[in-house]
């Protein structure tokens, strides 16, 4: 069941939902694995029993929707998780009987993107990794799950006249859904500084080094201690770091009664921020979708923009994607005035 999901965060969510289902229908077993085997064995021998338990669980969740305790989308996600488990366990279930009466979930969230002021406050959080993470996600539009695969060799600076104008980043390298996007010069600087800091602290950094890793005790002399034993910071670790930073910086407060969503999501909001800022900058919509690895319908088979063409369009958005975009724009205007004078 878990092997059907590549991303650790996805596995964790599906596992949690299935576990709640097993607990609700009182499946015996001390561990999730024991409960899963029990349900799978009994479900294959008695599909009516399996269907009855699933319907009972879904009916309970629908009542919670009516009470405004959860959203319809939450119920849909429960069904997806249980359905995947049953398919992997070869339990034949008539899913039309279950899905026909499901409450409809929104196809989009009604949250917003963070403001420039909020992002500037976020990167003040006292963790050496936060700037590199925020700058990278905001200027590339990658999903938080991409950090599970991102190694140092997957990011390469692009120079013009001896100056870094952007950096190319290969996302999900070696996987079926591998693609490339770009990051801003400021994101490249933050990442390079972070990798340099790790190297001077004693870590043997190379192309295979994961871009994000755990922190270490800086009180230990350089070249010694846990700095030399890097442990990859998974996408779940990045997610938790971002959430800690948002709370610590006063950008998130306890939800008011009746509200289920915070103003903006901790990680996915940066992907939305990227798309919005690129649109404001005037990038071609199809190029934005390409850099986000979104499907563009039939154009997937016919639209073949070159890397250079995508880069040129992306460069138009650099000043809009930089957290210090106002400063960059001001510096650009100053340089233009100097040239005219």
Question: Can you describe what each PLM-predicted range is?
Answer:
Residues 116-145, 271:
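Basic, Lys/Arg- and aromatic-enriched nucleic-acid-binding interface segment
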Residues 204, 239-290, 294-295:
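Short, basic (Lys/Arg/His-rich) helix/loop patches that form interaction surfaces
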Residues 1-9, 18-109:
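N-terminal core-binding DNA-recognition domain of tyrosine recombinases/integrases
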Residues 137-164, 283-290:
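Short, charged phosphate-coordinating catalytic segments
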Residues 173, 292-338:
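Catalytic-site neighborhood detector that most strongly recognizes the C-terminal catalytic loop/helix
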